């Protein structure tokens, strides 16, 4: 069995020789082997392919010259598996007649090398019969009555499509590297030349020449969908800039989704995709009334975050009857149960008095007593609009991530960005700095307000920032000045997020970090505007979840 990775690989040539072919789609949890053999900044897909090849008994691997990362992958595989057929097929960037002739010759050279390696023989007539019988792979299509989503960018694994399917969304097109079905042209006079022409006439990848009219093809496809997910792979140089260019002229909502091709990022991917779908169809969570006559109706929203679990009980008049904030422990389900019991006690209600419960936050799917779950992006938008309808831009800094959310006048999400791959600038980061300065978390923000010397924290990596703080302590700098420097570093990072969604006033800050006056002041200075902060900023997401619950029952 030979493995391959690229749509330009002449798969049918090998299949006609009786060789089993398998497209390598990495499904890994770590890059242990790649970290030993490859540079840290090599693209995550290339690392994943190496891990898969190390696990499976491939006869060989067919690679193409699509990027430098794949070239380095070839070097590593060639050195590590000298007994296998590791072949780099040099794919031309030009797709016209000269490119077709060049690629045909290179394919013939590869066939000759494989014949020497395997002892098999390529028969052009047998190949012709094989491709005549080859069924064209089924293409995607728009579906009436469904939310139609297009996928663009770098190749994406099946988990993304599975999440879309679970949420009843239809993939109307997939223009990633291997998303479309293979295009096979049959030319009985010039068999291999015709086949090669078909390979190079597929939807062009980013490395192909500009004359391939990729932008026009995207424009044509984009008109058939409600929204587009643009996927990039960590450390991939080919696609990230295309998203920025498309964002400037494409008249469809777009979600930029970067993955590292490991299972570890599945929860973050799910949150982004579900929030994007919710923003495209905000009415999706409205259900049929399940009222209880004249009896007062109560609903609950519960936000399971990494640091705190927050619950809100709301009545049918949209009034908050009680809320609770408890520390999230090692088990999100246990914390959620504790928050439930506490908020019911405060409201003087029993569990059976609650008509509907909506969960949100990273632990939302682990809350067994919830009737439904909604992403924290949508819930923060709805909650912010509830507390202040003038709010258009939200900065949410929680325990493990930061978010910037742009709302329309109805409180619906227009755009959002998240930072959940780095602890810097989050509540956990502040806790670490407070421990280093030997002050409580509550004191950290207060002492920052008494600063007299401007200190700049140059590193926003949480590990390096801690080392920088230790160096400042060694230089006998005042705690207040260091704390203020940390607050401004967080504000700088937050400002970058806000700029990406568009800084439309009024502004609101939510999450536990909104209780830190030092960070609040630093952010206000950076954006040049005041921040609206409600009395309990940690319950905004839970309040939004409760509002979603009301829409289900009223």
Regions found by a protein language model. Give the residues of each.
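An N-terminal assembly and electron-transfer interface module characteristic of large anaerobic redox
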Residues: 1-298, 317, 422-429
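Glycine-rich phosphate-binding loop plus the immediately following alpha-helix
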Residues: 331-332, 409-453, 547
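Glycine-rich phosphate-binding/hydrolytic loop that grips phosphoryl groups
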Residues: 430, 534-554
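Conserved phosphate-binding/catalytic loops in two-lobed NTP-binding clefts
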Residues: 252-260, 376-377, 524-543
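Short glycine-rich, Thr/Ser-proximal phosphate-binding strand/loop in the N-terminal lobe
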Residues: 301-334, 338, 413-416, 420-421
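Gly/Thr-rich phosphate-binding beta-strand-loop-beta motif of the actin/hexokinase/Hsp70
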Residues: 293-317, 392-411
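Glycine-rich phosphate-binding loops at beta-strand->alpha-helix junctions
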Residues: 362, 499, 503-526, 538-541
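Adenine-nucleotide phosphate-binding core of ATP-dependent small-molecule kinases
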Residues: 465-498, 538
């Amino acid at each position: 069995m030979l493995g391959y990775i690229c749509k330009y690989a002449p798969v049918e040539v090998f299949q006609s020789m009786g060789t089993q072919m398998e497209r390598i789609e990495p499904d890994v949890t770590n890059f242990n082997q790649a970290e030993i053999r490859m540079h840290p900044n090599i693209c995550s897909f290339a690392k994943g392919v190496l891990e898969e090849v190390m696990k499976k008994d491939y006869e060989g691997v067919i690679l193409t010259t699509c990027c430098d990362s794949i070239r380095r992958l070839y070097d590593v595989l060639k050195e590590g598996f000298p007994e296998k057929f590791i072949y780099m097929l040099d794919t031309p960037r030009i797709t016209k007649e000269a490119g077709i002739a060049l690629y045909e010759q290179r394919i013939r050279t590869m066939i000759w090398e494989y014949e020497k390696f395997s002892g098999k023989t390529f028969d052009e007539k047998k190949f012709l019969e094989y491709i005549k019988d080859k069924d064209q792979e089924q293409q995607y299509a728009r579906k009436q009555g469904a939310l139609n989503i297009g996928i663009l960018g770098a190749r994406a694994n099946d988990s993304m499509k599975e999440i879309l399917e679970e949420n009843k969304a239809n993939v109307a097109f997939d223009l990633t590297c291997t998303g479309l079905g293979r295009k096979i042209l049959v030319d009985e006079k010039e068999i291999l030349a015709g086949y090669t022409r078909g390979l190079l006439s597929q939807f062009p990848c980013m490395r192909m020449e500009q004359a391939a009219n990729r932008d026009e093809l995207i424009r044509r496809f984009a008109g058939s969908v409600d929204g587009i997910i643009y996927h990039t792979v960590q450390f991939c140089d080919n696609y990230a800039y295309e998203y920025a260019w498309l964002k400037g002229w494409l008249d469809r909502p777009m979600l930029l989704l970067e993955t590292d091709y490991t299972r570890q990022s599945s929860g973050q991917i799910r949150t982004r995709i579900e929030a994007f779908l919710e923003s495209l169809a905000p009415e999706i969570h409205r259900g049929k009334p399940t009222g209880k006559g004249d009896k007062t109706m109560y609903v609950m929203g519960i936000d399971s975050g990494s640091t705190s679990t927050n619950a809100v009980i709301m009545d049918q008049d949209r009034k908050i009857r009680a809320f609770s904030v408890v520390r999230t422990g090692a088990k999100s389900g246990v914390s959620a149960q504790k928050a439930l019991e506490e908020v019911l006690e405060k409201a003087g209600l029993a569990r059976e008095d609650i008509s509907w419960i909506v969960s949100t936050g990273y632990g939302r799917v682990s809350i067994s007593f919830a009737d439904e779950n909604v992403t924290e992006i949508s819930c923060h938008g709805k909650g912010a609009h509830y507390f202040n309808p003038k709010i258009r831009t939200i900065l949410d800094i929680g325990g493990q991530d930061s978010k910037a959310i742009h709302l329309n006048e109805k409180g619906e999400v227009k755009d959002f960005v998240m930072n959940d791959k780095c602890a810097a600038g989050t509540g956990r980061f502040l806790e670490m700095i407070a421990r280093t300065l030997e002050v409580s978390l509550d004191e950290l923000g207060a002492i920052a307000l008494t600063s007299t010397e401007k200190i700049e924290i140059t590193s926003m990596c949480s590990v390096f920032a801690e080392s920088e703080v230790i160096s400042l302590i060694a230089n006998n700098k005042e705690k207040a000045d260091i704390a203020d420097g940390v607050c401004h570093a967080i504000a700088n990072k937050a400002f970058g997020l806000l700029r990406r969604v568009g800084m439309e006033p009024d502004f609101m800050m939510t999450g536990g970090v909104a209780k830190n006056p030092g960070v609040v002041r630093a952010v206000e200075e950076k954006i040049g505007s005041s921040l609206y902060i409600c009395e309990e900023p940690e319950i905004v997401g839970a309040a939004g979840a409760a509002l979603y619950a009301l829409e289900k029952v009223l």
